[in-house]
Curated annotation (Swiss-Prot):
Entry superkingdom: Bacteria
InterPro entries listed in its UniProt record: Peptidase_S1_PA, Peptidase_S1_PA_chymotrypsin
Regions annotated as coiled coil: none
Transmembrane segments: none
Organism encoding this protein: Mycobacterium tuberculosis (strain ATCC 25618 / H37Rv)
Protein name: Uncharacterized protein Rv1815
One GO CC term, this protein: extracellular region
UniProt keyword list: Signal
Statement: the UniProt record of this protein carries the keyword Signal: yes
Induction / repression: Positively regulated by alternative sigma factor SigD, probably directly.
Signal peptide region: 1-26
Keyword rRNA-binding tagged: no
Length: 221
């Protein structure tokens, strides 16, 4: 499923999502960052990536709700702009099946957008990064915190992880990233679900291509 909230979109920080006005934003500035807890209707998820320049944030598409996106303490941080979500409803998925699962959130004018993870490390976007089985990755979710392991398999727009990567309810949408010794982390996925007993994420490379097709921008930081 692909859904765009009907409103003209341009790559500027002045964009507002459909139905959003500055008056709906919280009077107190909110820091928006990858790894923070977000709420939409009755869904609790993790924010995956924040582009401070575009003032757009990303999480899993299946986290979507019908109204505003808020922080843990229900302060409005923005509104949904676009989603793709074809996450299978069963307990299994074939490796050749394409999984798309992202949500783009246009951030409110009065929030502070940051790309710093809870660990203090910057999270950068390099959409051209190609993953390989056995590669070391980490995942951050609001329920499990940061857990690290390796890529188990690379599939059609998504990949699975093992050897230490954990997930529980609330971790959906969280960032999966390369965490080299020293320097910034590089996002490589948005956490999706657990398939065949393995935690899984949609590829950031594929997601970035979908974002470009849907919104005409490429998340970079």
């Amino acid at each position: 499923m692909v859904r765009l909230v009907p409103r003209a979109f341009a790559a500027t920080v002045a964009l507002l999502a459909a139905g959003f006005s500055p008056a709906t934003a919280s009077a107190d500035p909110v820091l928006v960052f990858p790894g923070m807890e977000i709420r939409q209707d009755n869904h609790v998820c993790t924010l995956g990536y924040v582009d401070p320049a575009l003032k757009i944030a990303f999480t899993a598409g299946h986290c979507r709700g019908g109204g505003a996106v808020t922080s843990r303490d229900y302060k409005v941080i923005g509104h949904l702009r676009a989603i793709r979500d074809n996450t299978p409803s069963g307990s299994t998925v074939a490796t050749h099946e394409l999984i798309a699962d992202y949500e783009a959130i246009v951030l409110a004018d009065d929030v502070t957008a940051s790309n710093i993870l809870p660990s203090g490390r910057a999270l950068e976007s390099r959409p051209g990064v190609v993953l390989h089985p056995g590669q070391a990755v980490c995942h951050f979710g609001v329920s499990t915190g940061e857990t690290c392991g390796t890529v188990e398999s690379v599939n059609n727009g998504w990949f699975t992880m093992s050897h230490g990567v954990l997930s529980e309810k609330g971790d959906s949408g969280g960032p999966v990233y390369l965490a080299p010794d020293g320097g910034p982390a590089q996002i490589v996925g948005i956490f999706n679900s657990v398939w065949g007993g393995f935690p899984a994420a949609v590829s950031w490379r594929s997601t970035s291509e979908q974002v470009h097709a849907d919104l005409g921008v490429t998340p970079l930081a």
